């Protein structure tokens, strides 16, 4: 009787291993595959070119569309080597446009 129980147990364990390895018990989820893009395009913020008049400031030209820190940061990114507080009258600069 002990041999029969041992043989049945071994056969049952082997069946469980076979079933688990061949068929599996956890369903496989088909996850969508996304293709990675080789380059990510760096988009420059929208801008308009304006010729500065005497008395104009960056804030007076752009308006109050965003926070002053963001406006200054975007202006200086569009115009390298130019500080927002040092614009000159008669010169054309790129000013950020906000929706």
UniProtKB/Swiss-Prot annotation:
Cell compartments where the protein resides: Secreted, Cell wall; Membrane
Keywords linked to the UniProt accession: Cell wall, Membrane, Secreted, Transmembrane, Transmembrane helix
Cellular component annotations (GO), alphabetically ordered: extracellular region; membrane
Transmembrane segments: 6-26
Its membrane topology: Single-pass membrane protein
Signal peptide (from-to): none
Disulfide bond positions: none
Claim: RNA-binding is one of the keywords in the record: no
Keyword Isomerase applies: no
Domain LysM: 48-95
Protein name: Uncharacterized protein YqfZ
Organism name: Bacillus subtilis (strain 168)
